[in-house]
A protein has these predicted regions:
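FAD-binding subdomain of flavoenzyme oxidoreductases
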Residues: 2-139
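C-terminal substrate-recognition/cap domain of FAD-linked oxidoreductases
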Residues: 102-103, 112-117, 122-214
């Protein structure tokens, strides 16, 4: 499962991690490959296709074949590996997968920016990326749903009176100073594009509060 993969990496290969997260850590890695899973972190690192270097699969006739692998470049013939990715199990069953990992950045943070209109929120996403900032994730949050969900699970959504819709940003950096600088820049860009307020989750408890509501 994705949970067991993440647990193994955290204990044994701490410098690297697997960013893809479809929303459920109970997901099977083989299923993620064959479904071409995505998730909110696709903003920075792409969907599952971006991570898969190779797969060993079982074809409908029982043949077991290896497609791709650890090579950085392989342009021999048809790219059957990417034909299978996203085929939803109709062409083969995944037995093994060779995955691309990324350097683990020690500091992660969450930022909520509030807007009066959906148009301002959507425009801000593009402006942040134009500034060269690629967040780990960014998600549009309907205020009524966010507040209602928070009340249902006995949590508190940080924005209630400011604006009508929110953007939830997740960012990661190598240092704490860089994290706050990035979050501050995002907040400033959003404010220049119609944001009426912003809140940075200061610690892991506040971040977990936002993610649980999300």
């Amino acid at each position: 499962t994705l949970a067991s993969l993440n647990e193994y990496l955290a204990k044994n290969v701490h410098a690297l991690y697997f960013p893809c997260h479809p929303g459920d850590e109970g997901a099977q890695v083989g299923g993620m490959c064959i479904e071409n899973a995505g998730g909110v972190r696709a903003v920075k690192h792409g969907i599952m296709r971006s991570y898969i270097k190779g797969m060993k699969v079982c074809l409908p006739n029982g043949d077991i074949v290896q497609l791709g692998g650890k090579l950085m470049k392989n342009n021999m013939g048809y790219d059957l590996l990417h034909l299978l990715i996203g085929s939803e199990g109709t062409l083969a069953v995944v037995l093994e997968a060779t995955l691309k990992l990324y350097p683990r950045l020690e500091y992660t943070g969450a930022l909520v920016c509030s807007f009066n209109t959906t148009e301002d929120a959507v425009k801000s996403v593009g402006e942040v990326q134009k500034a060269g900032i690629i967040p780990l994730a960014v998600e549009y949050m309907d205020r009524a749903i966010s507040v209602g969900t928070a009340e249902h699970i006995e949590r508190t959504w940080p924005m209630k009176d400011e604006g009508k819709v929110d953007l939830l940003y997740l960012v990661e950096e190598a240092t704490e100073d860089a994290l706050y600088e990035t979050a501050g820049t995002i907040a400033e860009i959003c404010e220049n594009n119609g944001a009426v307020g912003s809140v940075i989750a200061e610690d892991s408890k506040q971040q977990r509060n936002l993610l649980d509501i999300r």
